[in-house]
């Protein structure tokens, strides 16, 4: 059981809108062998849209509006990715997702640096001491000076940083990155499908001059010396405490720097961590199953108007058709068709372990924050609820459809997307979102 839990890596990809989260997710799935061709996040009519953007609105607008869950195997690790929305209209979904992950990759646009949404999300990570890796994206376009970017990351995100790869120029002059973790040079070839080759180079030899030219080689040596002098050695313990963030540079769209990120990630990222409940702390290697619902989504399958409750397993092993105790309802339930996800595609699973995220069919029995156990009364802490910031009245244009409207509003409330208020003077309904 322990070996199964040890090989789990559950993380979220977060960023400001359009920094390249979904493009990075696509490339990680490409390496995991889950998709043969990476989709593009484009607003125009490209045939292949991103796997994690499965809603119609996401395909039309080229943005993510709901958190997608995808899982794949890579180098004997089982990886669960949650691709989150960056747009602040859908922020509550993202904040809640952060309670279900053990680590986070933050994507930063190399030209724009740290933006407002990134700052807010980092605060949530800091509250939970979540380990963070930073990926500076779009280096194949004109970007800020890497040293300026690192200073900005330290100041804005209030965390120590340590670059593990270093860019050689940016924009049209972008030559590649030098991997400080493995001491290898990766030369850039713009390609959306091909994986780039690595060249082992000692930076003090002429081999480096031959690969990238003498002026750039000289500049790179000086910069790497400065990096080693200014930034502390990378310390895995500090990373796991959420005090230090390793930084990678690359271009997700051109598939560059992504494999270094993935290889280092599976090596250093934490396996499932203990989860706090109001009663006690739950360790992932406990023999008994516990889990909590952090998200509910309707209409994943267009042919069925079904709801799915996303459940994060916190300890033990989940088995299909086994009775489990629903703490809020105070009754046992069994699940005949639990599923695992590839965004919209789902497959039925017979068993799942701590760290995994499973989908449970929901016909109104679940609410966000519900706990499932083998009989113990536990209440998981830290599913945040936020005060709404935007309010709108709801008007029903067709009085004959009063029932459908009421049902639709209930569904939104259950999904935790919005909160409902009723004006006590005139009974009008008001929806509030974060």
Where are these regions (language model features)?
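Structural and coupling elements of P-loop NTPases
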Residues: 1-434
């Amino acid at each position: 059981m322990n070996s199964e839990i040890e090989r789990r890596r559950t993380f979220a990809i977060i960023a400001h809108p359009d920094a390249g989260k979904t493009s990075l997710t696509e490339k990680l799935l490409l390496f995991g062998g889950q998709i043969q061709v990476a989709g593009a996040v484009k607003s125009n009519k490209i045939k292949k849209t991103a796997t994690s953007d499965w809603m119609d609105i996401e395909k039309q607008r080229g943005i993510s509006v709901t958190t997608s869950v995808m899982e794949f195997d890579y180098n004997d690790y089982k990886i669960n990715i949650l691709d989150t929305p960056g747009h602040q209209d859908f922020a509550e979904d993202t904040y809640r997702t952060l309670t279900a992950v053990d680590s986070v990759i933050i994507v930063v646009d190399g030209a724009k640096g740290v933006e407002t949404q990134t700052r807010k999300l980092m605060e949530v990570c800091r509250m939970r001491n979540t380990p963070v890796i930073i990926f500076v994206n779009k280096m194949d376009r004109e970007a800020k000076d890497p040293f300026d970017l690192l200073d900005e990351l330290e100041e804005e995100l209030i965390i120590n940083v340590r670059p593990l790869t270093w860019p050689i120029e940016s924009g049209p002059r972008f030559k590649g990155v030098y991997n400080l973790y493995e001491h290898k040079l990766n030369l850039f070839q713009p390609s959306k499908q091909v994986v780039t080759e690595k060249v082992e180079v000692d930076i003090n030899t002429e081999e480096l001059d031959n690969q990238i030219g003498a002026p750039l080689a000289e500049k790179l040596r000086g910069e790497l010396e400065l990096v080693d002098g200014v930034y502390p050695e990378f310390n895995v313990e500090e990373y796991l405490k959420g005090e230090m963030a390793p930084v990678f540079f690359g271009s997700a769209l051109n598939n560059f720097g992504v494999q270094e990120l993935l290889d280092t990630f599976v090596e250093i990222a934490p396996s499932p961590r203990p989860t706090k409940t109001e009663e006690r702390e739950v360790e992932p290697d406990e023999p008994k199953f516990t889990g909590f619902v952090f998200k509910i989504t309707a209409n994943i399958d267009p042919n069925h108007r079904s709801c799915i409750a996303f459940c994060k397993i916190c300890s033990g092993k989940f088995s299909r058709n086994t009775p489990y105790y629903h703490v809020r309802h105070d009754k046992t339930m069994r699940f005949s068709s639990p599923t695992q996800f590839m965004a919209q595609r789902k497959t039925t699973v017979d068993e799942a372990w701590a760290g995994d995220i499973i989908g449970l069919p929901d016909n109104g029995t679940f609410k966000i924050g519900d706990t499932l156990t083998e009989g113990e009364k536990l209440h998981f802490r830290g599913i945040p609820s936020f005060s709404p910031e935007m309010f709108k009245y709801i008007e029903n244009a067709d009085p004959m459809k009063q029932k459908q409207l009421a049902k639709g509003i209930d569904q939104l409330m259950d999904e935790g997307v919005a909160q409902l208020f009723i004006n006590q003077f005139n009974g009008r309904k008001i929806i509030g979102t974060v």
